Amino acid sequence: MRFRKWAPLISAVFMMSCFTACGGGQSASATKIALSANGVSVEGAAISADPDDAVYLSRETINTDKNGDGGASSAQTEVSVIHITSPGTYRLFGTLEEGQIRVDLGEKAAKDEKAIVTLILDNAHLRCTVAPAVLFESVYGGSSEENAAKTGANILLAEGSINTINGSHGAYRWAQGAVSSRMSLNIGSEEDVVGTLSLTADQEGICVEDRLTVNGGKIRISAENNGIRMNKSDSVAEVNGGDVHIAAGLGGSGGAVDTEGQLLLSGGTVIAVGGDKDPVLRGGNGVFVNGGTVVALGSPSEGLAADSEQVTMELRFDEEKELKDTIVVTDAEKNAVFAYDPAADEILSGSPRIYTAAMISCEAFSEAEMYRLYLGGRAEGSSAGGVYDMSAVTAYSGGTEQAFCITEEQNESGGVLLSSGESTSPSGTAVPSRFTEFYLGSKVNTFFGIADK
């Protein structure tokens, strides 16, 4: 096997790795649930209070204890809980204040392939300050890769809809998100005009035990802690499509995606901004970038996998960067191949952030090429959520070059790092699988490279 190596010219660390995508679908006929301050209706009739019905309403008192001591800080809040107890598709619209959508199909649901619920959010606005706003407690598991498309918990964003979820967290580990699921969860959008979901969380944004699959939709997550949290070592978080922007760690700690298992980025756009204490992306069993556009800004990501499919650039800066300037990557001729303007990303509006590491990947990157990184300046063209459509960018000017790198062939036995015109041969260290170790100046010791397929 052959390797390629970067030749950086500043103290930023580059990592090239060979780190594929589905969309949403049309929904079946659905039971309509109308939400309002004047009451909840199901198919035009007032919602039932009978637990034997497929959809019913209860009022529950939730104890909140901010200090965990049961003292004067404790309070009780009454919450409206809309229970869904039968498989099917449910279309929600309107506003639910201090309420929760709870899906529980019973103890045997986990192994019942018919125990599937799809919530279509059709201009729905859900708010709960003391618990998850959406809670999938018991549905079909469907956690294996083969059954990912047949997951029991599904959220579908209605065509052209604008939806908001503002939620808290529960007492259980699996219920720490504004949207929480004890089983696997799929999120997508109806076709044609993409639906939007803006999610705000006082803890985790989305918390799933087994498998989270995002297939489509415009999704914006603002979270005090992690944007997406997966608790199990065999869990999988996967993005196949859609436009996902995450601002995490707003409370100081937390990453954009934190999974004990695998993180698979296979399509769509993912913009991830984390806090300054935890990795912006972390996969206990690997972070795989296989397709799409990925920008991760914050503390260095953890678990980047070498046996992935898309060329990825990782940079670690010697000093903090304020997240305000356009980030541009050009080719050797200084033609822009990637551009992102955080000032145009609505999820970062009014939220000053810093970063010490950046991970960038897009389909335009290829092996054996030279790239330049710029911060600042102005790109002429159209962008969506700060990400530029490179086919429409006509010019770029005014930026400050941070570094450039060149890939060239190198064999497994070692090689040289070209830095400030000097050559240095690695010695006395083991060569990690799929990577060659290099030294960058006197401060940095890191791995970077890309393996030929």
Residue ranges and their predicted role:
Residues 1-10:
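Bacterial N-terminal signal peptides that target proteins for export
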Residues 17-21:
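C-terminal motif of bacterial Sec signal peptides marking the signal peptidase cleavage site
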